[in-house]
Amino acid sequence: MLFCYFLLNNLLNRFNGLNTFNNNILVIKELITNKLVYKNSISINYNSRIKSQKRIIQKINRLRIPYDIYGLRIIYEDSLDMNNSQFAYIIKDFICNNFYTIDYLYDDYIKYPKINKYQSLHVYIITNILIEIQIRNSLMNFNAINGTASNYY
């Protein structure tokens, strides 16, 4: 029941939730920057977005629930190991230890890539809105945007 409330809240307050979303993103960034211990060879970038009303409707028309109205992508690069995929799990564990997550929505596309070779971890956190967090390294991100996994569906 609580989950339905958050999902409905996301749908109804897509634009009203912008300040809340931005505040949550700042909290996540600050926590990762100040509390997560990682090597100097790793740099982290963040991309956030709010799904457009058109994309929400398209997803509903495909008979899917739009859990990902609010999204944050965490992209890291390890200058010593460009293929470092283990750091994604460190970030995921850190997020899971600091936020309320919905385990049954968790997807591990790093260990189990999609057919189109898409790789990323998807974690969903509940604040007063539901936020999808995608965690991937820069090579995975390049493939998602420009490579074999660049198709949207």
Where are these regions (language model features)?
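Nucleic-acid processing machinery
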Residues: 1-153
